[in-house]
From Swiss-Prot:
Alphabetical list of Pfam families matching this protein: Ribosomal_L10
Function: Forms part of the ribosomal stalk, playing a central role in the interaction of the ribosome with GTP-bound translation factors.
Protein keywords: Ribonucleoprotein, Ribosomal protein, RNA-binding, rRNA-binding
Gene Ontology cellular component list: large ribosomal subunit
Alphabetical list of PROSITE patterns matching this protein: RIBOSOMAL_L10
Originating organism: Agrobacterium fabrum (strain C58 / ATCC 33970)
One BP annotation, GO: translation
Family recorded in the similarity comment: Belongs to the universal ribosomal protein uL10 family.
Quaternary state and interactors: Part of the ribosomal stalk of the 50S ribosomal subunit. The N-terminus interacts with L11 and the large rRNA to form the base of the stalk. The C-terminus forms an elongated spine to which 3 L12 dimers bind in a sequential fashion forming a heptameric L10(L12)2(L12)2(L12)2 complex.
UniProt xrefs under InterPro entries: Ribosomal_uL10, Ribosomal_uL10-like_sf, Ribosomal_uL10_bac, Ribosomal_uL10_bac_type, Ribosomal_uL10_CS_bac
This protein's name: Large ribosomal subunit protein uL10
GO molecular function, one term: structural constituent of ribosome
């Protein structure tokens, strides 16, 4: 890479660190090209991105961002996975790490919070924003459904009473 290309790459990576909801850093030594391509396609399908950058350039790109606290993670062969949705990158990376023992999660960041490997693992177990929205809508709809059931119940009970009286009169 020439100096101008490096400057452009650092600027681009700096924007990524500023705009991402979450960033995960992991070692990938020993991962084959096919496995890496599979990982990248899974991340892309979920709405995230995977980049491999020189550690020195990544550290420079971190300067002036909220994620600056994770500069110590960039040692060895590292990859950077990021997404706008804070739950996507940790989930996809942890799923890939389960099937491929050569991927070792080092940590990451979520906004201004620097995460260690355990925090990334626990973040991956949380439901996504869409799942949380669905649960919230379900909770909001439940009382309305119950109210409709309660309002309809007296009318149906009254109808059963009239039906019972009608059958009683017919039998007599």
């Amino acid at each position: 890479m020439e100096r101008a290309e490096k400057r452009e790459f650092v600027t681009e990576l700096n924007e990524v660190f500023k705009a991402s909801g979450s960033v995960v850093v992991a070692h990938y030594a020993g991962v084959t090209v096919a496995q890496m391509n599979d990982f990248r396609s899974k991340m892309r399908a979920a709405g995230g991105t995977v980049k491999v950058a020189k550690n020195r350039l990544a550290k420079i790109a971190l300067q002036g961002t909220e994620s600056e606290g994770m500069t110590n993670l960039f040692k060895g062969q590292t990859l950077i996975a990021y997404s706008v949705d804070p739950m996507i990158a940790p989930k996809v990376v942890m799923d890939f790490a389960k099937t491929n023992d050569k991927v070792v999660v080092l940590g990451g960041s979520m906004g201004a919070t620097t995460l260690n490997a355990e925090a990334v693992k626990s973040l991956a177990t949380l439901p996504s924003l869409d799942e949380l929205r669905a649960k919230l809508l379900g909770l909001l709809n439940a009382p309305a459904t119950r109210v409709a059931t309660v309002v309809a119940a007296p009318a149906s009970q009254l109808a059963r009473v009239f039906s019972a009286y009608a059958k009683k009169d017919e039998a007599a």
